[in-house]
Design a protein with these regions (language model features):
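Alpha-helical recognition domains of nuclear gene-regulatory proteins
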Residues: 41, 61-62, 66, 82, ...
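Interface signal in eukaryotic adaptor modules for cytoskeleton, membrane trafficking
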Residues: 59, 64, 71-105, 166-168
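Alpha-helical interaction elements in eukaryotic regulators
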Residues: 34, 54-55, 59, 75, ...
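Eukaryote-specific, cytoplasm-facing alpha-helical/coiled-coil scaffolding segments in long proteins
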Residues: 85-91, 108-112, 219-233
Length: 261
C-alpha cells in the first residue's frame, strides 16, 4: 500500500525531549497572533497544521500526508480499498441495523409529533368552549401534558436526525458488496470503526486533538481518547504501533498536525 518516493530523503527521528526541555519551551513561549491553536494550547512554536482536500476523504488524506513526510507514497483510493477489504458480514449488518433503527425512529417520531400537535389543538379548542372551572382545569392539565410530550419528542427527533446523518451513506445499501463499494467512495466518512481498523492494518496510532474543544474553552477534552472498535485488536489484547500520527479534529474535519517540520 506504500511505495518509497525515490529522491526524497527520510528525515531522521526526532530526539526525545525530556520533561525539563518541554517545560523550558513552555516557559519561553510568547503567544503571537500568527500562532496556530495547537502552538497556543501546547505553548510550543514547533507545531504546524496541514490542510487537505476535505470532504469524506480528510482522515485518509492525513494518513497519506503523514507518510509522504517519511518518503512513503500512498493515496486515498488505496487506503479506502484496504479498509473495504476488512469488512465482514457482521460489520455490514451492524451498520445496516443502525441505519434502519434510526430511520424507523425518525419516521415514528415525526408521526407522533404530528399527532400530538393535533391533540393539543383539539384540547385548546375544547378549553375555549368550556365554562365550568373544574373541567377547564382538567383540560388544561391534559394540554400541558400533551405539550410536554410533544416538546420532548421534538428534542429526541433532533438527536435521532443527527445520528441518522452519520449513517446516511447506508441509504439503499442492502448487501456487503454494496457496503464495500460505498467505503471505497467519498460518501463514507471515517468513523470509530474505520479509525480503529486503519490503526490495526497500518500499525499506526492516531493522537487526536480537538480544536472544537479548544475553541469552546473545554481544555480538559482537547485530547480525545478514541474508543477501541476493532474486535481483532480486542482479542489480541495488545497493540504496539510503529508510527503515531497527530491530527486535529474540528468536529467535522481532520487535519494533520506536524512537529518540528
Amino acid at each position: 500500500i506504500f511505495v518509497k518516493i525515490n529522491g526524497v530523503p527520510v528525515p531522521p527521528l526526532l530526539k526525545e525531549e525530556s520533561q525539563k526541555e518541554a517545560k523550558n519551551m513552555r516557559e519561553k513561549y510568547h503567544e503571537s497572533p500568527k500562532d496556530n491553536w495547537v502552538e497556543k494550547y501546547m505553548k510550543n512554536n514547533n507545531f504546524s497544521i496541514q490542510e487537505n482536500e476535505g470532504g469524506g476523504d480528510c482522515l485518509f488524506a492525513t494518513i497519506r500526508d503523514a507518510f509522504a513526510n517519511i518518503a512513503q507514497q500512498t493515496s486515498v483510493r488505496k487506503l479506502r480499498k484496504k479498509l473495504a477489504g476488512e469488512v465482514t458480514q457482521d460489520i455490514f449488518e451492524n451498520y445496516k441495523e443502525q441505519y434502519d433503527m434510526y430511520s424507523a425512529s425518525l419516521v415514528r417520531d415525526t408521526n407522533n409529533i404530528k399527532q400530538l400537535a393535533q391533540d393539543y389543538n383539539l384540547l385548546k379548542q375544547k378549553f375555549e368552549t368550556i365554562i365550568d372551572r373544574d373541567e377547564q382545569k382538567i383540560v388544561l392539565k391534559q394540554a400541558k401534558e400533551v405539550k410536554a410530550e410533544h416538546d420532548k419528542l421534538v428534542q429526541e427527533k433532533k438527536v435521532t436526525a443527527q445520528m441518522l446523518k452519520e449513517y446516511k451513506f447506508m441509504k439503499g445499501i442492502d448487501n456487503i458488496d454494496q457496503f464495500k463499494k460505498v467505503i471505497r467512495d467519498c460518501d463514507f466518512w471515517a468513523d470509530t470503526w474505520a479509525i480503529s481498523t486503519l490503526e490495526r492494518i497500518l500499525n499506526i496510532k492516531f493522537i487526536v486533538l480537538s480544536s472544537e474543544s479548544y475553541k469552546n474553552k473545554d481544555l480538559k477534552n482537547v485530547l480525545l481518547c478514541g474508543q477501541l472498535n476493532d474486535t481483532i485488536l480486542e482479542q489480541k489484547g495488545r497493540f504496539t504501533p510503529e508510527f503515531y500520527i497527530m491530527i486535529d479534529y474540528t468536529g467535522d474535519h481532520y487535519k494533520l498536525i506536524g512537529y518540528k517540520k
